[in-house]
Amino acid sequence: MARVTVQDAVEKIGNRFDLVLVAARRARQIQVGGKDPLVAEENDKYTVIALREIEEGLITSQILDLRDRQEQQEQEAAEIQAVTAIAEGRR
């Protein structure tokens, strides 16, 4: 079982409440969203992996927001392409 000291992660994020939000969001991305961990898994739980990523400075709230926006833009572009292809097929 991995032991994690969250003090370094708290210092990276700013306060423990925001740390909980960021770590939970990242753990959910890894577990459900199919995102690859940025650190070695070492048989750790998703929350521990998220905390280790935060401690190492690989994940912040801003980074998560940026990645979400990029994914949303890519999805919107794909949807526009699909709609355009359908519209051109009807002509």
Curated annotation (Swiss-Prot):
A GO cellular component annotation in the UniProt record? DNA-directed RNA polymerase complex
> Which keywords label this protein?
DNA-directed RNA polymerase, Nucleotidyltransferase, Transcription, Transferase
Its top-level enzyme class, in one word, is transferase
Q: Which InterPro entries match?
A: DNA-dir_RNA_pol_omega, Pol_omega/Rpo6/RPB6, RPB6/omega-like_sf
SUPFAM superfamilies hit by this protein? RPB6/omega subunit-like
In this UniProt entry, which cysteines form S-S bonds? Answer: none
* UniProt keyword annotation of tRNA-binding present: no
Q: Name one GO biological process term.
A: DNA-templated transcription
A GO term, aspect molecular function:
DNA-directed RNA polymerase activity
Stated EC number for the protein is 2.7.7.6
Q: Which reaction does it catalyse?
A: RNA(n) + a ribonucleoside 5'-triphosphate = RNA(n+1) + diphosphate
Write out the similarity annotation.
Answer: Belongs to the RNA polymerase subunit omega family.
Primary role = Promotes RNA polymerase assembly. Latches the N- and C-terminal regions of the beta' subunit thereby facilitating its interaction with the beta and alpha subunits.
Which NCBIfam families does its entry note?
rpoZ (TIGR00690)
Subunit relationships: The RNAP catalytic core consists of 2 alpha, 1 beta, 1 beta' and 1 omega subunit. When a sigma factor is associated with the core the holoenzyme is formed, which can initiate transcription.
- Name used for this protein in its record: DNA-directed RNA polymerase subunit omega
**What organism is this sequence from?**
Sodalis glossinidius (strain morsitans)
